[in-house]
Design a protein with these regions (language model features):
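Membrane-interface helix-loop-helix junctions at transmembrane boundaries of multi-pass membrane enzymes
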Residues: 174-201
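Membrane-interface alpha helices of multi-pass inner-membrane proteins
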Residues: 69-85
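Transmembrane-helix motifs of polytopic, lipid-linked glycan transferases
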Residues: 2-13
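Membrane-interface transmembrane helices that cradle and orient dolichyl/undecaprenyl
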Residues: 53-68
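Perimembrane helix-loop-helix junctions
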Residues: 90-114
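Single conserved hydrophobic/aromatic residue that forms the stacking wall/gate
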Residues: 210-219
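Juxtamembrane membrane-water interface segments that cap and precede transmembrane helices
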Residues: 138-160
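Membrane-embedded helix bundles of polyisoprenyl
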Residues: 20-35, 44-52, 73
């Protein structure tokens, strides 16, 4: 599902100038060679919500009435953070990028705030009605828990190899965007700069051994 949404995201916003299947093939190759990714984890649900959030953030680009787009973007960030609480940290980056996309106003900021809190309102109602308040407190406790910085010994070899490969791909791709960015439209350059910032932001939680995706499979 995540691979399909990545394809649609690229086709909808024209992030890559030339239509090709290489980037999709690489993604599916990475999934294939990682046995632990063949099961459905809570982090997979969070990843899909994350992609929906990016979609609506991109839709808000230079929109005069962007409150609705930011509401839905932060709604999915909030929903995903219930499964992976550290997604909440991306709210700061989302607000910064919304400002760069010229879509952040007081009204859209309020829409974003309401969107993020709505999943927690629903979670609170469920937890209160069934007397399971620990379910509501759990994401906030996870959010405030950090592991050791740069303690990579807890990672398995295939995890280190995957992270290293992704980092090399990021360096090459980011360098290409900087060198050949003048060939893209202004909107596309803004999207690509967002993806570069997002990738740098993603490597921050990787530095903390505790901030890994939930490892309890659903199936």
């Amino acid at each position: 599902a995540a691979g399909y949404f990545l394809i649609e995201l690229n086709n909808r916003f024209g992030i890559i100038r030339m239509r090709a299947s290489v980037q999709t093939a690489i993604y599916f190759l990475l999934v294939t060679v990682c046995p632990e990714m063949h099961l459905l984890y809570a982090g997979d649900v969070a990843a899909i919500a994350f992609l929906f959030s990016i979609y609506f953030l991109f839709k808000s680009y230079q929109q005069s009435q962007a409150a609705g787009y930011l509401f839905y973007s932060f709604l999915f960030i909030g929903a995903g953070s219930i499964f992976f609480p550290q997604l909440t940290f991306f709210s700061v980056l989302w607000l910064f990028e919304a400002y760069r996309f010229q879509s952040l106003t007081f009204r859209s900021f309020c829409g974003a705030l309401i969107g993020w809190t709505m999943p927690y309102w629903m979670l609170f109602g469920h937890a209160f009605f069934y007397d399971q308040m620990e379910l509501f407190y759990h994401p906030f406790r996870e959010l405030a828990t950090f592991g050791d910085l740069l303690n990579l010994q807890v990672l398995q070899p295939w995890e280190l190899a995957t992270l290293g490969y992704l980092f090399v791909l990021f360096i090459v791709s980011a360098a290409h965007c900087v060198v050949a960015g003048f060939e893209d439209k202004i909107r596309t350059r803004a999207y690509l700069q967002f993806l570069i910032d997002l990738t740098l932001f993603l490597f921050i939680p990787v530095s903390y051994t505790h901030l890994t995706l939930p490892t309890t499979p659903y199936v």
